[in-house]
C-alpha cells in the first residue's frame, strides 16, 4: 500500500493530496491496475466523488472493512485481471524503450533539438 506517486509500482492507492487523487483515479478507472481506498479520506475528501458518486464515512471501522475487502479483491478474479493489465503495461513500457520504440525515438528528437545547438 502506498500513495499513488507516478514512479511507484502500485496495487492499493491511499491518495493524500496534490497529484495523488488524480493519479489514483487514472490507475483505477483508466488503467485498471490498482485499487483505491476511499474510507481513509478526511475533511473535504468525505464529499461524494464527482467521478463515481462514492462518499466516505471516514470512520476507523469503515477503513478496516474497506482494507479487508480490498485484500480479498486482490486475491479474486478482479485482482488477477489487474495483474494481467499491469503485466501488459510493463510490456508496453519495455517496447517503448527498445531501439525503435516510441519513447526512445522521442528522447532522441529531444536531444537532437536541444543539444545539437550546444556543440
What are the roles of these predicted feature ranges?
Residues 1-119:
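Catalytic core of nucleotide-sugar-dependent glycosyltransferases
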Amino acid at each position: 500500500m502506498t500513495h499513488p506517486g507516478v514512479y511507484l509500482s502500485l496495487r492499493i492507492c491511499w491518495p493524500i493530496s496534490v497529484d495523488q487523487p488524480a493519479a489514483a483515479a487514472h490507475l483505477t478507472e483508466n488503467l485498471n491496475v490498482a485499487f483505491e481506498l476511499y474510507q481513509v479520506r478526511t475533511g473535504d475528501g468525505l464529499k461524494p466523488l464527482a467521478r463515481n458518486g462514492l462518499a466516505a464515512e471516514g470512520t476507523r471501522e469503515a477503513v478496516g472493512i474497506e482494507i479487508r475487502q480490498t485484500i480479498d479483491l486482490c486475491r479474486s478474479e478482479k485482482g488477477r485481471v489487474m495483474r494481467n493489465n499491469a503485466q501488459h503495461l510493463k510490456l508496453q513500457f519495455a517496447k517503448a524503450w527498445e531501439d525503435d520504440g516510441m519513447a526512445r525515438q522521442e528522447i532522441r528528437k529531444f536531444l537532437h533539438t536541444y543539444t545539437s545547438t550546444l556543440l
